């Protein structure tokens, strides 16, 4: 193992066992990186060195426009606040909480420059989920948008490692902005090793317990140098925008580090509903759009009379892209959506097609820099045309934070994404289904067991099971089968009560949009819930 610049070796000490590491592949010339690398230095200082310092790097819909030079100066000041005022040392985990905004982006880069580890969280998360993430990562510091401080305040008593929280987007005298004013615009970026952990991205697995995926500074840059360069083929004149949060690696890549690597501009939208995105395209004229299939469908249906002519590339990921949605968008804009599959574990898209080489029904081919195949349950390659487990290798790979589930995701050096695929005779990969119990609804990954546990906390519920149910608008929705306690009455009022209970306890997007009341749930003799039977019931109810 190489050296480390981390003083706090928490992440390094919690890497998976070496025999469970993915095999990394660096078979493109641009993937040859130096031993020491800080991704903020590469992305910001590098852009300025290439003569792009006066180009606009990041914009907001509220009129903020920072050049690369201004963004770096802001990130340098934030790094000074972290180190000089908050006591951050390289390797500390810094919880980052905020909507997509220029200040959120600057804070992320400030954390990178300080050699710390960013633990970004979605704005919708509640105190319980923030507690899980902060506890698992042992976050010692936090930067939080003042408008989102309430849930973090509720979480703090259960997070003993969280020593210092500082708020941004505030005029308070002890806030980040006030402290920035007293700092010079320079900072000596920590010379991290390329393999030092830069971020811990959290995702939920089938048990609902958060899994922290560790990505290095090299991972960030390698992701920038594969799919964006060889498949997206954007240019410095492009303006990126979209809906995925920067806390998702889909959003971190597509809306921050990819455009920075290219020398382009990113337009960050705090509340990117489909209607809001239509307004953004009309008013601000972005050229590259990232969002989920559900959003593309809603935008297409509401696009009548809208001027969307500035768009030239549209990217979809997060869930399967229905053929009907692809057609709707093509009819509305004349643009073929670039579909792809990625994962938090792999950082970003690893199978995709280009905008000029599309095969309806297929996700695409392995992105240059990556290899993919379909394996059987014993890890043996399957012939083309047979459905099996998708396996991937490349310059990035899964390294869970101190989690036994690493052995499930990485086997024989391959990353097993949890997706069932087949490879056709021409080498195109065709999606079949998820192989676990995750529910992918409108681009969000929702763990059924977590929703079950939340419903079971309500005094009216005796038993419940949660599965995905097909939905024309959202792809899939959360559907709950509920057994009520004696004396409780099934009906619309009870349904609304249970839905509001879930919304108030965990992130609102996880609530069951459909609730069916049953006498009993199908279980094995040992008491294990037979979710496959619930899925069958949900399919039959279409």
Kindly give the residue locations of the regions a language model identified.
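Structural core segment of the AMP-binding/adenylate-forming
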Residues: 1-10, 109, 113-179, 285, ...
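Conserved AMP-binding/adenylate-forming
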Residues: 62-66, 81-128, 245, 445
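Conserved AMP-binding A3 loop
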Residues: 65-69, 198-222
């Amino acid at each position: 193992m190489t050296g480390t610049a981390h003083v706090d070796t928490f992440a390094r000490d919690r890497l998976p066992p070496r025999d469970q590491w993915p095999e990394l592949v660096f078979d493109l010339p641009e993937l040859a990186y130096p031993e020491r690398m800080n991704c903020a230095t590469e992305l910001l200082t590098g852009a300025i060195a290439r003569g792009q310092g006066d180009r606009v790097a990041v914009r907001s819909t509220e009129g903020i426009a920072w050049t690369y030079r201004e963004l770096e100066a802001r990130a340098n000041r934030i790094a000074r606040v972290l180190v000089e005022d908050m006591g951050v040392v390289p390797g500390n985990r810094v919880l980052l909480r905020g909507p997509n905004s220029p200040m959120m982006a600057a804070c992320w880069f400030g954390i990178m420059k300080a050699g710390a580890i960013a633990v970004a969280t979605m704005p919708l998360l509640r105190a319980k989920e923030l507690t899980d993430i902060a506890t698992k990562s042992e976050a010692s510091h936090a930067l939080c948008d003042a408008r989102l401080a309430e849930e973090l305040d509720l979480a703090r008593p259960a997070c003993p490692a969280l020593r210092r929280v500082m708020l941004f987007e505030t005029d308070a005298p002890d806030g980040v902005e006030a402290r920035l004013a007293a700092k010079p615009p320079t900072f000596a970026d920590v010379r991290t090793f390329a393999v030092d952990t830069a971020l811990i991205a959290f995702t939920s697995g089938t048990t609902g317990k958060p899994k922290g995926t560790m990505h290095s500074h090299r991972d960030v840059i390698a992701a920038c140098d594969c799919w964006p360069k060889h498949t997206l083929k954007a240019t410095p004149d492009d303006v990126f925008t979209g809906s995925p949060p920067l806390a998702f690696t889909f959003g971190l890549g597509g809306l921050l580090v990819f455009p920075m690597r290219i020398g382009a501009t990113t337009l960050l939208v705090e509340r990117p509903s489909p209607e809001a995105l239509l307004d953004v395209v009309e008013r601000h004229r972005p050229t590259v759009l990232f969002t989920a299939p559900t959003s593309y469908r809603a935008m297409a249906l509401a696009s009548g009379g809208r001027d969307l002519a500035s768009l030239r590339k549209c990217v979809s990921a997060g869930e399967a892209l229905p053929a009907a949605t692809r057609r709707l968008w093509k009819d509305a804009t004349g643009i073929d959506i670039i579909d792809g599959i990625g994962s938090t574990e792999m950082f970003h898209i690893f199978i995709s097609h280009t905008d000029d080489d599309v095969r309806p029904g297929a996700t695409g081919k392995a992105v240059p820099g990556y290899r993919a195949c379909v394996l059987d349950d014993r890890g043996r390659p399957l012939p083309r045309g047979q459905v099996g487990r998708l396996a991937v290798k490349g310059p990035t790979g899964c390294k869970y934070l101190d989690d036994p589930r690493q052995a499930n995701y990485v086997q024989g050096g391959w990353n097993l994404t949890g997706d069932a695929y087949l490879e056709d005779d021409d080498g195109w990969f065709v999606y079949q289904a998820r192989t676990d119990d995750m529910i992918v609804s409108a681009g969000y990954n929702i763990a059924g067991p977590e929703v079950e546990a939340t419903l079971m906390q309500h005094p009216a519920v005796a038993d419940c099971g949660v599965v995905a149910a097909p939905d024309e608008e959202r792809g899939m929705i959360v559907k709950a089968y509920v057994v009520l306690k004696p004396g409780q009455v099934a009906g619309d009022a009870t349904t609304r009560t249970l839905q509001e209970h879930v919304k108030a306890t965990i992130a609102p997007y996880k609530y069951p949009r459909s609730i069916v009341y049953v006498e009993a749930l199908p279980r094995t003799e040992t008491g294990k819930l037979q979710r496959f039977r619930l899925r069958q019931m949900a399919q039959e109810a279409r």
